[in-house]
């Protein structure tokens, strides 16, 4: 399986410590990217989840970005404005937008009582997030607080059965090298 374009802080061992404090040992972090078949029979049947976390208080999909510089809102809600350290600005697709179909798919497949949410996670230590960005766009250091807020938000709802949720999500996963290769080829043609 391929290596994801991440900074070291997200690595499973480091990230697991962040979840231990909230969940004890009752959580699942998928090791590496996860390819799901969310739209069989269409031109783009698969989607890549950078990181999947399943906790007793929710199923979380993280789209990770190793962008440096300042990240600000754009005039287009599906985009973000990145101002590089050298001052050059460009528009990039928002991780929230990239997660939209993945979140929708998981919500359709899992019991409605299990919360499913996503976030854009910026892992570069050289990133500065504009204060007016949505709260689901966060720096790696903000992850523990974001998770605590999700746990508080979902208090009183049915607890997610972590093992069953993992099994349900992985039913739609393709872990093969061929699957990832075909997905990458389709993704390249989509964004030309």
Regions found by a protein language model. Give the residues of each.
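Surface-exposed interaction regions that form or flank ligand-binding interfaces
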Residues: 1-47, 56-59, 68, 87-192
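Short glycine/proline- and charge-enriched loop/turn segments
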Residues: 77-87
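Cell-envelope/extracellular polymer assembly enzymes that use nucleotide-activated donors
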Residues: 50
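Active-site beta-strand-loop-beta-strand hairpin of nuclease catalytic cores
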Residues: 53-78
């Amino acid at each position: 399986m391929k290596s994801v374009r991440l900074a070291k802080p997200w690595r499973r061992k480091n990230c697991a410590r962040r979840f231990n404090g909230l969940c004890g040992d009752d959580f699942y972090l998928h090791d590496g990217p996860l390819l799901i078949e969310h739209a069989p029979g269409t031109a783009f049947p698969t989607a890549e989840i950078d990181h999947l976390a399943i906790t007793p208080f929710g199923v979380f999909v993280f789209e990770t970005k190793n962008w440096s510089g300042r990240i600000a809102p754009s005039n287009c809600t599906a985009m973000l404005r990145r101002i590089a350290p050298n001052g050059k600005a460009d528009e990039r697709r928002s991780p929230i937008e990239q997660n939209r179909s993945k979140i929708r798919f998981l919500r359709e497949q899992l019991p409605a009582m299990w919360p499913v949410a996503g976030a854009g996670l910026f892992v570069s230590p050289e990133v500065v997030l504009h204060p007016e960005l949505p709260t689901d766009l966060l720096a790696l250091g903000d992850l523990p607080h974001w998770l605590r807020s999700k746990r508080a938000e979902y208090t009183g709802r049915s607890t997610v059965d972590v093992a069953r949720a993992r099994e349900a999500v992985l039913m739609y996963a393709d872990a093969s090298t061929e699957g990832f290769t075909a997905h990458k080829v389709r993704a390249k043609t989509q964004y030309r």
